[in-house]
Amino acid sequence: MIIKVGDNVSVNVRKILPREGKVTNISIATTADDPAGEAGMQVKEYDTALDYAGSIDYETENGDQYWAYFSQIEKDI
């Protein structure tokens, strides 16, 4: 799945219902001790088939801001 800044995604937050929001940032890890990619590269687009470590920042419809690892993204909506 290709994810782009501005896409709406569904994120597994280990609850009954996933959380949905708009991607505001994509970070790719460049070192093993930074799995979320906070100190890594910020990109505008990422293909999850590449299976890199990293994370997204996203904002819900009501303005709450969260982040999630790539592995938590369920789908692009």
Can you describe what each PLM-predicted range is?
Residues 4-5, 26, 32-33, 50, ...:
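Serine/threonine-rich, low-complexity intrinsically disordered segments
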Residues 1-14, 22-24:
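Short coil-to-beta transition motif at edge beta-strands of beta-rich domains
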Residues 18-32, 40-43:
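Short beta-strand-centered aromatic/proline hotspots
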